[in-house]
Amino acid sequence: MPPKQQGPSKKSEQKRKEKVIEDKTFGLKNKKGNKNQKFVAQVENQVRNNNTRMDLVRQQEAAKKKEKDELLDIANLLKPVEQKVAKDVDPKSLLCVFFKQGLCGKGAKCKFSHDLAVAQKTAKKNLYADSREVEKDEETNENWDSDKLNEVVNKKNKNKHMIDIVCKYFLEAVENNKYGWFWECPNGGEKCQYRHCLPEGYVLKKERKAMEQQKEDEISIEELVEKERAALSSKNLTKLTLQTFIAWKKKKLRERKEKEEADLKEKKEKIKSGKHNGMSGRDLFLYDANLVNNDDDEAGDIEMEKEEVDENEKVFEIDANFFKFDGMDDELTDQMSKSSTAVESTAKGMAKMDINEDLFDIDEDVENLDSDED
């Protein structure tokens, strides 16, 4: 155990107090003035009771600190999660969760509301449900008084029911943004026989006007196509007709044929130089079939079951002529002559139809396109 702290003894403390009193009241004790005697008594009281008063102050401070520590511990135990709010939401429209639990010490400086009724103020009234009917459904006769009972009896005797027509004052209030919790109907208030709710699917005039404005701003697909067509420069582009499409198709087929011939030539050169990497079996077979059958002698014996084939079944034979592209231009010429005949017969039938000629207005002569492309 640590040694006890040795403080001044009571006798030495008493002597010290007497000396302090003598120093402060030197020459005043023998004076008989009332003020002097009160001053001497006050000094003696302060010096002799100073420790007692200081001890009392220390005890009060210790009690306050203990109470504060207890409140801090309780606050840490019951401390809610830090309250967050979106950017577009007013913090004063939300109740402070710390204040709700009695733990908020910010007071007026708190950015959140300390009004317990703020939730009721911010909640909007339902436009599609009559509050009187809702209260009537939730109401029971347990809390009725004599006045309420008489009112119910009189209503039952009169047999007066609510009309399904919507109250015109209610509609005006909704259209003018005046309807809310404190709105009262001019036609008798709660006793109004008309309904104070909008029917299902009803669209307000202000919303209808906004929808019409939005509909006017929208553009149809036909208008969008015409707009994009008008934006294109007709001088630098060729209009699409049957002749231009056939010429374009013929050009694409010729380009594909030339590309395939160039690729085949490149593959043959690779095979001649002994570079078989990246070559498929079909490419090797087309170049030389012996390159594929060289390993027949080295391969092992394989037993295979012969598949039964119907002798009367007709087989479609595919030979090298099937993939031959020679004379393609002649075939295209024949096809073009046949298609031109078909176009003439179709044009006779389309002459009877109403067609917007502006869509097919050809400003350039495309008869010499074939010769230009060749």
Curated annotation (Swiss-Prot):
Protein name (database record): Zinc finger CCCH domain-containing protein 15 homolog
PANTHER family linked to this entry: ZINC FINGER CCCH DOMAIN-CONTAINING PROTEIN 15, ZINC FINGER-CONTAINING PROTEIN P48ZNF
Organism per entry: Caenorhabditis elegans
Pfam families, A to Z: DFRP_C, zf-CCCH
Record key words, sorted: Metal-binding, Repeat, Zinc, Zinc-finger
Disordered: annotated segments: 1-20
InterPro entries membership: ZC3H15/TMA46_C (IPR032378), Znf_CCCH (IPR000571), Znf_CCCH_sf (IPR036855)
GO molecular-function terms, A-Z: zinc ion binding
Entry similarity comment: Belongs to the ZC3H15/TMA46 family.
Claim: Iron is one of the keywords in the record: no
One Gene Ontology cellular component: cytosol
GO biological process: cytoplasmic translation
Domain of life (superkingdom): Eukaryota
